[in-house]
């Protein structure tokens, strides 16, 4: 049995194949996922699993160079926005490398989804609970 934090074999496989600047998205339950992108559906019911648990687990395995958020999250979901930015600051310290935060409109966010290696759907049901993770390098 795998000893690491991340046990999901599909997500582990995607992370293992990522190259520098490749992207994966962690999505809320409502984000439209293009059929051309690998969809890893973790959603069991509303709120399970929640967005932050999935983000924290994935970033235990993945080096993150940058993230993309919909600008709307700042005003429409400020509690989650604050939790995400606090966590990213902690992750920067753990990785000993900065993480750039890129803001786009929600419509722009959706247009870049076909370029992702995978979209991981959570059970999160709060607005704009979506993040693109850009793969970094560990050296």
From Swiss-Prot:
Tell whether Nucleotide-binding is among the UniProt keywords: no
Predominant subcellular localization, coarse grouping: cytoplasm
Where is the protein situated, by its record's location annotation?
Answer: Cytoplasm
Q: Give its E.C. classification number.
A: 5.4.99.62
Q: Quote the cellular component terms of the Gene Ontology held in the record.
A: cytosol
Q: Which reaction does it catalyse?
A: beta-D-ribopyranose = beta-D-ribofuranose
Biological-process GO terms, alphabetical = D-ribose catabolic process
Outline the subunit composition. Homodecamer.
EC class name: isomerase
Keywords, comma-separated and alphabetical: Carbohydrate metabolism, Cytoplasm, Isomerase
Transmembrane keyword on record: no
Q: What positions does the entry give for substrate binding?
A: 28, 106, 128-130
The record's section on InterPro entries has: D-ribose_pyranase, RbsD-like_sf, RbsD_FucU
Function according to Swiss-Prot or TrEMBL: Catalyzes the interconversion of beta-pyran and beta-furan forms of D-ribose.
In which organism is this protein found?
A: Proteus mirabilis (strain HI4320)
> Which GO molecular-function terms appear in the entry?
D-ribose pyranase activity; intramolecular lyase activity; monosaccharide binding
Q: Where on the tree of life does the source sit, at the highest rank?
A: Bacteria
- State the pathway, as annotated in the record: Carbohydrate metabolism; D-ribose degradation; D-ribose 5-phosphate from beta-D-ribopyranose: step 1/2
What this protein is called in its record is D-ribose pyranase
Q: Which family does it belong to?
A: Belongs to the RbsD / FucU family. RbsD subfamily.
Where in the sequence is the active site? Answer: 20
Source taxonomy: Bacteria, Pseudomonadati, Pseudomonadota, Gammaproteobacteria, Enterobacterales
Question: NCBIfam families, per this entry?
Answer: PRK11797.1 (NF008761)
């Amino acid at each position: 049995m795998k000893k690491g934090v991340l046990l999901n074999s599909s997500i582990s496989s995607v992370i293992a194949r990522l190259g520098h600047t490749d992207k994966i998205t962690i999505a809320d339950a409502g984000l439209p996922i293009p059929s051309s992108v690998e969809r890893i559906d973790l959603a069991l019911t509303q709120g399970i699993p929640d967005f932050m648990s999935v983000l924290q687990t994935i970033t235990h395995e993945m080096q993150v160079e940058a993230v993309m958020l919909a600008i709307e999250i700042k005003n429409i979901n400020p509690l989650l926005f604050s939790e995400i930015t606090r966590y990213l600051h902690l992750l920067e310290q753990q990785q000993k490398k900065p993480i750039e935060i890129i803001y786009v409109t929600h419509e722009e966010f959706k247009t870049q989804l076909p370029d992702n290696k995978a979209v991981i759907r959570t059970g999160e049901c709060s607005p704009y609970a979506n993040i693109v993770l850009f793969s970094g390098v560990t050296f």
